């Protein structure tokens, strides 16, 4: 049976374009369209689609409000379309907070080298998030924004970013006894929510630097880092060339670039480079993980989270060869079980963990719990 899709956009041209692309894949079927958020909410209840594609800026009711109402009344996997502007980035992150699973730029030429690649990407994203239809999450409950430009106080409540329903803490974690000097986390589809859930649970005194590699457009990473910084007790920043890695600071790889680590453990710096056109991902998890293995050897605590494809597998292999620790997010809590599956199937990860317990496991491992 085909995956049923509801297409929501106030542009008749875009509704038609998206519908044609979706209907050209035999596994997909557009069952209806909506021209604004209010209509989308009503049709989501009545038609019960498997996936909804949603514009952000629409009359009557905007896409973010529509996502919140749909997730409250009839939770459905939602793929957002957004502009590649700073405001578009902020709105997209709001939509992910509200419960949307993934996003794509509205200008397809910005996400692919040719039309065929763009068509395939849209179709695959819809198919991937449709698999979460029977296991939908609730929207993120965000804490109130800080009233000043300073980072929130350590006593501030962390945002319980959504994922799998919380599991009972039946397993008591034990530290391995290894010593670490760096934490490295790589992710793609579903990563913004996953990273928010993990990072908001880390204390200000987290004992070493954190490098974050999230597949994301260049215009989105600054907005994402800024948002995380307002929500987290640790400092979060978009990485810049020459940054000296400091304990308790998370460095988000800038979109459209590669992030590498240079120097020696304890005095390492970041190099931000273009990386050429040979790499499929910018930023690429393999690139950062590989450089971390060379600089830190067996002193890296690394994680591969939800995401499509296999980026991170080869970098994780290098980390394991150097003696470092690699964990993977488990299938049930992933939006897309691609990157973690690649690591787990290759026998590289030592533990497969549910998202809602990764932060707890990290704190035990580094001696803070």
Curated annotation (Swiss-Prot):
Q: Domain CheB-type methylesterase: where?
A: 176-369
Q: Does the keyword Hydrolase apply?
A: yes
Recall the GO molecular function terms of this protein's record: phosphorelay response regulator activity; protein-glutamate methylesterase activity; protein-glutamine glutaminase activity
What is the recorded post-translational modification?
Answer: Phosphorylated by CheA. Phosphorylation of the N-terminal regulatory domain activates the methylesterase activity.
Q: Tell me if Hydrolase is a UniProt keyword of this record.
A: yes
Write out the GO cellular component annotations. cytoplasm
Where is this chain compositionally biased, Low complexity type? 146-171
Task: Specify where it is mainly localized.
Answer: cytoplasm
Q: What does this protein do?
A: Involved in chemotaxis. Part of a chemotaxis signal transduction system that modulates chemotaxis in response to various stimuli. Catalyzes the demethylation of specific methylglutamate residues introduced into the chemoreceptors (methyl-accepting chemotaxis proteins or MCP) by CheR. Also mediates the irreversible deamidation of specific glutamine residues to glutamic acid.
Q: What is known of its domains?
A: Contains a C-terminal catalytic domain, and an N-terminal region which modulates catalytic activity.
Q: What is this protein called?
A: Protein-glutamate methylesterase/protein-glutamine glutaminase
């Amino acid at each position: 049976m085909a995956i049923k899709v509801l297409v929501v956009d106030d542009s008749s041209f875009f509704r038609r374009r998206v519908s044609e692309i979706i209907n050209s894949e035999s596994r997909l079927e557009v069952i209806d369209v909506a021209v604004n958020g209010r209509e989308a909410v009503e049709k989501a209840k009545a038609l019960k689609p498997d996936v909804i594609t949603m514009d952000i800026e629409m009359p009557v009711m905007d896409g973010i409000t529509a996502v919140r109402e749909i997730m409250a009344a009839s939770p459905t996997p939602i793929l957002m379309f957004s502009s590649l502007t700073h405001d578009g980035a902020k709105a997209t992150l709001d939509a992910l907070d509200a419960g949307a699973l993934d996003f794509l730029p509205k200008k397809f030429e910005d996400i692919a080298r040719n039309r065929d690649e763009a068509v395939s990407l849209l179709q695959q994203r819809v198919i991937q998030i449709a698999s979460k239809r029977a296991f939908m999450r609730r929207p993120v409950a965000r804490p109130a924004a800080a009233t000043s430009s300073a980072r929130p106080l350590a006593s501030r409540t962390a945002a319980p970013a959504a994922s799998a329903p919380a599991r009972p803490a039946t397993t008591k974690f034990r530290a391995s006894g290894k010593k670490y000097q760096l934490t490295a986390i790589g992710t793609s589809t579903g990563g913004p929510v996953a990273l928010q859930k993990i990072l908001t649970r880390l204390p200000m005194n987290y004992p070493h630097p954190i490098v974050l590699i999230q597949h994301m457009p260049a215009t989105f990473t600054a907005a994402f880092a800024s948002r995380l910084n307002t929500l987290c007790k640790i400092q979060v920043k978009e990485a810049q060339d020459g940054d000296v890695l400091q304990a308790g600071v998370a460095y988000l790889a800038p979109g459209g670039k590669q992030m590498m680590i240079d120097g020696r453990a304890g005095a390492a710096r970041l190099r931000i480079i273009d990386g050429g056109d040979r790499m499929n991902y910018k930023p690429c998890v393999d690139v950062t993980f590989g450089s971390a293995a060379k600089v830190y050897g067996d002193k890296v605590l690394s994680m591969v989270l939800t995401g499509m494809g296999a980026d991170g597998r080869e970098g994780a292999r290098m980390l394991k060869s150097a003696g470092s620790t690699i964990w993977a997010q488990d299938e049930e809590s992933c939006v897309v079980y691609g990157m973690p599956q690649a690591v787990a199937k290759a026998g590289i990860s030592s533990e497969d963990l549910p998202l809602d317990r990764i932060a707890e496991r990290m704190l035990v491992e580094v001696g803070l719990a």
